[in-house]
């Protein structure tokens, strides 16, 4: 296309000799320029996504629908204040309850159970105040823009407009990308930028782009070490299939990226747990399910918890998860159908490239299988939704799965097949957008309304709780944490023991449970055995004051 435009520029005339309007010619050049397509596609997605994040959460959110987001935000605030990701534990805590969910008590303080890179980076950014908070919101938006632009670079110039559909076609990944306080969001942002840099390497041949792609993957792997082995294997296989002659440079860059990811976590593990090879999440798993036998190879237990944190599911569990999250979750079946495009794409490659890419596809399938479990949020529900845990774990797979149908359409020369495939991809993208904006309990509209509602409720509840008091709650820590000290309710007997110990230490205690669940009723019964009662403070909201009755 660029050649056609430049040939017209030399004479200033069109094909029949008439003078060409200079303004029209400049417009034609701009409209056909591949670089302009990249900028346009990226700018549109960046503006849409940044607006969505700011509309949903605001610039400095403290109310979240998920405790995972609250963990990262809380730890970031502590780091911003210079005290590290630690909460003081005022009492012995054998039940491991004197902290919010997804934290763990280590001695006289508690720390998050997540890999530390995400909340350390967030904490350092929040030290920049408004600028840092804007960057946290803008980074995932930039990732979406980079993914769309990277897809465009993989497409022929005449069909780069197809890249406009790529983020929406991977709608579960888009949903989790735009929840910036989830620790999956920086991983997906890193993958998106890696796709852009990798595509730039393939288009320009400059090895610096490959180094940048693997640096991005190294950051993503540092944020989520449980994805690291899969990310590096995929990067190695895709890169070797694309340019086998550069195998030495590829191996070296992948190894350097792995060292970068590993070093960051080893250093922060030592700061948090005191042991470089002992991560907080591994300690939490050991405490919940029992420690694994000692291994002669240091770090082997941690490696297993990273590769297969939940083991391999049974056929019944795996098939049910496949039905929910690959067949019936909105228009997701169209994304699965689009993988048929892998067949013609692979047939065009050399035998060596087909073997390497086939191995990469097998690794992606194994990864997806290892994350399909019913002992997760949404596992007990008969339907699939993007806000469930399994789609969150599978977001890198959804992201990469959006590429084959678009790459096939970019190369397809059959007019009817191109039109039919284009209609299916447009339907997938449109259906995905509808899921993200209209689906109950998972749309950005729902998240926006939740933040507004709970922010108002937080102001009202916080006025009824004295400063310094602790509040036991089963699930409401995700929006209470910023105004009150929150501890958690789990097993009723153990929670009653913890409350009794804290009450005997003369601490001012409250229980917050909006609904009288079976767990709450059992807790009341256990407290009664210990001469502890709950006095209603705000019956409408479920706030109770703990009262230690005289014997």
What do these predicted ranges mean?
Residues 184, 229, 379-412:
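Hydrophobic/aromatic-rich transmembrane helices and adjacent perimembrane loops
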């Amino acid at each position: 296309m660029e050649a056609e435009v430049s040939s017209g520029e030399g004479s200033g005339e069109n094909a029949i000799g008439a003078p060409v309007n200079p303004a029209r010619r400049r417009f034609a050049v701009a409209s056909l320029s591949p670089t302009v397509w990249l900028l346009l596609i990226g700018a549109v997605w960046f503006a849409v996504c940044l607006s969505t994040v700011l509309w949903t959460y605001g610039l400095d959110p403290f109310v979240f629908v998920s405790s995972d987001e609250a963990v990262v935000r809380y730890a970031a605030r502590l780091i911003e204040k210079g005290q590290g990701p630690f909460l003081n534990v005022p009492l012995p805590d054998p039940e491991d309850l004197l902290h919010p969910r997804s934290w763990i008590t280590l001695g006289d303080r508690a720390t998050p159970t997540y890999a530390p890179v995400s909340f350390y980076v967030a904490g350092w950014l929040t030290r920049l105040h408004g600028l840092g908070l804007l960057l946290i919101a803008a980074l995932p938006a930039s990732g979406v823009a980079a993914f769309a632009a990277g897809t465009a670079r993989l497409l022929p110039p005449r069909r780069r407009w197809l890249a406009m559909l790529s983020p929406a076609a991977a709608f579960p990944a888009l949903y989790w990308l735009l929840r910036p306080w989830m620790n999956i969001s920086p991983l997906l942002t890193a993958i998106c930028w890696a796709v852009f840099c990798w595509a730039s390497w393939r288009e320009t041949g400059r090895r610096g782009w490959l180094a940048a792609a693997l640096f991005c993957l190294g950051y993503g792997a540092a944020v989520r070490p449980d994805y690291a082995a899969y990310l590096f294997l995929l990067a190695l296989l895709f890169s070797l299939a694309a340019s086998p002659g550069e195998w030495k440079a590829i191996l070296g860059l992948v190894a350097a990226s792995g060292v970068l990811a590993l070093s960051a976590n080893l250093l922060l593990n030592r700061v948090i747990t005191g042991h470089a090879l002992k991560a907080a999440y591994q300690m939490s798993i050991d405490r919940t399910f029992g420690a694994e036998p000692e291994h002669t190879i240091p770090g082997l237990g941690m490696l297993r918890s990273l590769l297969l944190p939940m083991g391999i599911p049974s056929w019944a569990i795996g098939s049910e998860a496949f039905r929910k999250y690959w067949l019936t979750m909105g228009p997701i079946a169209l994304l699965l159908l689009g993988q048929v495009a892998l067949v013609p794409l692979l047939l065009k490659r050399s035998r060596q490239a087909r073997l390497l890419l086939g191995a990469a596809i097998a690794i992606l399938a194994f990864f997806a299988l290892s994350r399909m479990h019913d002992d997760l949020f949404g596992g007990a529900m008969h339907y699939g939704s993007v806000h469930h845990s399994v789609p969150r774990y599978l977001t890198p797979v959804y992201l990469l799965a959006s590429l084959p149908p678009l790459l096939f359409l970019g190369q397809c020369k059959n007019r009817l097949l191109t039109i039919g495939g284009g209609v299916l991809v447009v339907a997938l993208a449109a259906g995905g957008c509808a899921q993200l904006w209209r689906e109950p309990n998972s749309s950005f509209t729902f998240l926006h309304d939740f933040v507004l509602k709970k922010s108002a409720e937080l102001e009202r509840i916080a006025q009824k709780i004295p400063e310094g008091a602790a509040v036991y709650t089963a699930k409401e820590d995700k929006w209470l944490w910023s105004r009150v000290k929150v501890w958690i309710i789990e097993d009723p007997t153990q929670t009653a023991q913890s409350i009794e110990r804290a009450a005997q230490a003369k601490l001012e205690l409250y229980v917050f449970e909006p609904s009288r669940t079976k767990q709450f009723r059992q807790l009341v019964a256990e407290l009664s055995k210990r001469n502890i009662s709950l006095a209603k403070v705000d019956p409408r909201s479920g706030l109770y004051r703990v009262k230690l009755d005289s014997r």
